[in-house]
Amino acid sequence: MMLFKVLVITVFCGLTVAFPLSELVSINKELQNSIIDLLNSVFDQLGSYRGTKAPLEDYTDDDLSTDSEQIMDFTPAANKQNSEFSTDVETVSSGFLEEFTENTDITVKIPLAGNPVSPTS
């Protein structure tokens, strides 16, 4: 552990001598500018999909709040027939719990946990 501390201090001192403070400030500014440019280009690309202004400096607190987002309604229509899951005997709506049956008297027994159902012929 002590060897690690000595190594870290040595590397820090070496970097301080190799890169004076003025160079570190300019490197830091260049890094910040490149990161901001990268983020702005990503936001520009994402903004082209959303159709909104995307550069980082154009955003306000109102743009970033979720209250202003529009909530979409995904509830299915009540009696809309889904052709993928429908037959002439049974029509299942797009809702998970709604099922409309016609022209059938089939009863399906579903066993509960711990209550096995013996098949009846």
UniProtKB/Swiss-Prot annotation:
Query: One Pfam family, short name please?
Result: KAR
Q: Keyword check for Flavoprotein, yes or no.
A: no
Q: Which InterPro entries match?
A: KAR_prot
Superkingdom assignment: Eukaryota
Q: List the disulfide bonds.
A: none
* Induction per the UniProt record: By androgens.
Leader sequence segment? 1-18
Question: Would the keyword Methyltransferase be found if you checked this record's keyword annotation?
Answer: no
Q: Which residues form a coiled coil?
A: none
UniProt subcellular location? Secreted
UniProt tissue specificity? Kidney, submaxillary gland, urine.
A Gene Ontology cellular component where this protein is annotated is: extracellular region
- Keyword line: Secreted, Signal
The protein's name = Kidney androgen-regulated protein
Q: Which organism is it from?
A: Mus musculus (Mouse)
Q: What is the lineage of its organism?
A: Eukaryota, Metazoa, Chordata, Craniata, Vertebrata
Q: Which gene encodes it?
A: Kap
